[in-house]
A protein has these predicted regions:
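DE-rich acidic low-complexity regions and acidic surface loops
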Residues: 1-275
Length: 275
């Protein structure tokens, strides 16, 4: 079943694994595993501050403490001047836990959308370098500058190229609402508490990886097929992308000749755990 030509996305919901295939080669992997997921936002509590290694350990509700390096803490000055023991702090997971190591977290929150990435604590506007037209870059920057609140930052994603002002505005409003919900929850909850979790694997993969070069999306459940079709239709991307339900007897990853790579990744994770 392996296709050496087309660019496709393979979503094995049964295994919580997805792969982006470009010109017959796996270009990217998405894996949904464990209780702590990349992109999670937590209301955490500072437990230990270690100036000698310029880091702090924060409680995010897991059996392993979150690791917060000084460079990932907003503001100027020494780490011990910015953080205090038992302090409540909003952090985001930038690296999932591996083996005996807990998650790495940051206070520089980023919320990805379809066309934009909201950076609530980092003012400014940055446009993807993959958008090469100076005119289009200026147009997008002007639109975002008019729409965004003062004090927040926005990254304009490659997918924003050619999009209307209304579509960009809608995306920004969704992200701002998410951030407002995070702040409201942080004010009312006690740490450790999960404040926000990014969309499920299927939605995330389509949002992050699906573009005008995608020719096919292969899924392994009828439910996933229906969801993908609905998402593409809502995003007006359903005309050029073929959505296929795999019905073979062997697992989808095996049929697509991707399973060997997942085994290698699992072995590497075990090595990291033992190291």
């Amino acid at each position: 079943m392996k296709d050496l030509v087309s660019n496709k996305i393979v979503i094995a919901e049964r295994d919580n694994i997805a792969a982006v295939i470009e010109k017959g080669k796996v270009a990217e992997f998405y894996v949904h595993r464990g209780e702590i997921i990349l992109g999670d936002v937590y209301l955490a509590q500072v437990e230990n501050i270690l100036p000698s290694i310029e880091a702090a350990f924060v409680n995010v509700g897991s059996d392993k403490m979150g690791f917060l390096h000084a460079q990932d803490v907003m503001g100027k000055g020494a780490l011990q001047d910015k953080l205090k023991p038992k302090q409540k702090i909003v952090v985001q997971v930038v690296k999932e836990p591996v083996g005996h190591k807990g998650p790495r977290v940051t206070t520089e929150i980023s919320l990805p959308g379809r066309f934009l990435v909201l950076m609530p604590n980092e003012p400014g506007i940055n446009v993807s370098k993959k958008i090469t037209s100076a005119k289009e870059r200026a147009r997008l920057k002007s639109i975002v500058n008019l729409l965004k609140p003062v004090g927040v930052g926005v990254i304009v994603r490659t997918e924003a190229e050619g999009q209307s002002e209304s579509d960009i505005q809608e995306d920004l409003e969704i992200l701002l609402e998410k951030w407002n919900n995070i702040i409201t929850s942080a004010e009312s909850l006690t740490p450790p508490s999960l404040l926000y979790r990014d969309q499920d694997l299927l939605y995330r993969v389509i949002r992050e990886a699906c573009n005008e070069e995608t020719q096919e999306i292969v899924v392994d459940t009828a439910f996933a097929l229906n969801r993908v079709q609905n998402i593409l239709q809502n995003w007006h991307m359903n005309k050029n992308i073929n959505v296929t339900l795999y019905k073979g007897s062997e697992p989808l990853l095996v049929a697509m000749d991707i399973h060997n790579i997942t085994i290698a990744l699992a072995m590497w994770a075990t090595f990291c755990k033992d190291f």
